[in-house]
Amino acid sequence: MRPLSFRRRTAQARPDPAPSRLSYRVQRLLLTPLFHALIRVGLPAFVLAFGVGWLLQNQELRDELVAQTIALRTQIEQRPEFMVNAMSVSGASTELIEDIHEVVPIDFPVSSFALDLEAMDRIIGELDAVAEVDLSIQAAGILAIEIVERTPAVVWQTRQTLEILDAEGHRVGPIESRAAHAALPLVAGPGGNRAVAEALRLLEVAEELAPRIIGLQRMGERRWDVVLTEGQRILLPEREAELALARVIELDQAEDLFARDISVVDMRLPDRPTVRLNPDALDALWTIRGLTNDRIE
């Protein structure tokens, strides 16, 4: 038989197989994906950032790094394949090309990295005569600018200036003399620029009167007068002006209205058109009426 003391020593030497609570939590933490990611990515990133930060504490080293970075960037930007040597403008008149060179002065050759095409597009697009603009850098170092100019539609006369407008009323540019653009119809009066489309429709309706028409005058920024030669006028209503003008044209074709001694055809009340005689014709009419009355009496 074995002694009892030996059994007690054996029982005391046996280790406890259950881990401690702290050990269990540490083992679970080591097995989590987040901890693996921190060890694989976070720790190297921290070491790298710490090393770079420690190196950049040296002012001379920082200055050298900045200088090398600038030199490398300049070297890349100045490579021949990135250089722009000339500008090409298409679709623009000579005057507009001069304006473009004035608003976007470029000292060639220049690196394409130094050109802000978006800003240039905005600046050129703000020119009055430009409807559309497209910029691109093409092969052989050419800055290509494609322009769509506004098409002149009317001459707008204000108290101070003469300006050319397109069919939408956008300003194309000022002019010094009406004679230089005599082929364009004349529009006058405040607010005329905001009703160019209507003015063009009226002129189309009044094509039969074209040789007599001097222009259209905006009245009170709400309606049009058609100004004719010999001091004659057609006063149009605010609404359905085209229909009212068409009625006047029909009347002229039937009765040769504007060959008569009249000054105004008032269509502001379309249901009650009014014809106003010239002063001389009115005096003659009153004289005739007076003579007639004398004879009756």
Swiss-Prot record:
Keywords: Cell cycle, Cell division, Cell inner membrane, Cell membrane, Membrane, Transmembrane, Transmembrane helix. Gene3D superfamilies: Cell division protein FtsQ/DivIB. Residues 55-297 are periplasmic. The keyword Cell cycle applies. Pfam families: FtsQ_DivIB_C. GO terms for cellular component: cell division site; plasma membrane. Residues 82-150 form the POTRA domain. Its main location: membrane. One of its GO terms (biological process) is FtsZ-dependent cytokinesis. The chain crosses the membrane at residues 34-54. Residues 1-33 are cytoplasmic. It is found in: Cell inner membrane. It comes from the Bacteria. InterPro entries: Cell_div_FtsQ/DivIB_C, FtsQ, FtsQ_C_sf, POTRA. PROSITE patterns: POTRA. It is a single-pass type II membrane protein. PANTHER family: CELL DIVISION PROTEIN FTSQ. Essential cell division protein. Belongs to the FtsQ/DivIB family. FtsQ subfamily. This is Cell division protein FtsQ. It comes from Dinoroseobacter shibae (strain DSM 16493 / NCIMB 14021 / DFL 12). The lineage of its organism: Bacteria, Pseudomonadati, Pseudomonadota, Alphaproteobacteria, Rhodobacterales.
